[in-house]
Amino acid sequence: YGRRRHPKKLTPLAYKQFIPNVAEKTLGASGRYEGKITRNSERFKELTPNYNPDIIFKDEENTVMNQWPGVKLRMTEGWDEDGHHFEESLHYEGRAVDITTSDRDKSKYGTLSRLAVENGF
């Protein structure tokens, strides 16, 4: 009570490291596959658009800007319907995103992954 918590040190994720430590398609990481969502399905209406001006969507979070001033989160893929992912991809349900940074600096990806985990993704 009344004491301010010190922010914990962020440890970058290693290449191919998962949180939780299971692959994204497993039950423990993402739950059961519920089926592809198409524009004409009822579940499409449940998807929530994101209009955050701090995110650069490929079709051209503030935590990224705090970590690296002047750098923005760049989402390259979210909900998708084009069929180029594996059959039960979470992209078809709107439950997966592919992200990078606006400067496309791959050395930031481990910390970016950690930021995503810390923010509930």
UniProtKB/Swiss-Prot annotation:
Q: Where is the secretion signal located?
A: none
Positions contributing to Zn(2+) binding: H91, D98
Could you tell me which InterPro entries the record lists for this protein?
Hedgehog (IPR001657), Hedgehog_sig/DD-Pept_Zn-bd_sf (IPR009045), Hedgehog_Signaling (IPR050387), Hedgehog_signalling_dom (IPR000320)
Kindly list the GO molecular function terms attached to this UniProt entry. calcium ion binding; patched binding; peptidase activity
* Compartments where found: Secreted; Cell membrane
- Any one cellular component term from GO for this entry? plasma membrane
What's in the keyword line of the UniProt record? Answer: Autocatalytic cleavage, Calcium, Cell membrane, Developmental protein, Hydrolase, Lipoprotein, Membrane, Metal-binding, Palmitate, Protease, Secreted, Zinc
Modification comment: The C-terminal domain displays an autoproteolysis activity and a cholesterol transferase activity. Both activities result in the cleavage of the full-length protein and covalent attachment of a cholesterol moiety to the C-terminal of the newly generated N-terminal fragment (N-product). The N-product is the active species in both local and long-range signaling, whereas the C-product has no signaling activity. Cholesterylation is required for N-product targeting to lipid rafts and multimerization.
Q: What is its main location?
A: secreted
SUPFAM superfamilies linked to this entry: Hedgehog/DD-peptidase
Q: What family does the database annotate?
A: Belongs to the hedgehog family.
Subunit and interaction comment: N-product is active as a multimer.
Q: What does this protein do?
A: Intercellular signal essential for a variety of patterning events during development. Signal produced by the notochord that induces somite patterning, dorso-ventral patterning of the brain and early patterning of the developing eyes. Displays floor plate-inducing activity. Binds to the patched (PTC) receptor, which functions in association with smoothened (SMO), to activate the transcription of target genes. In the absence of SHH, PTC represses the constitutive signaling activity of SMO.
About its domains, the entry says: The sonic hedgehog protein N-product binds calcium and zinc ions; this stabilizes the protein fold and is essential for protein-protein interactions mediated by this domain.
What name does the UniProt record give this protein? Sonic hedgehog protein
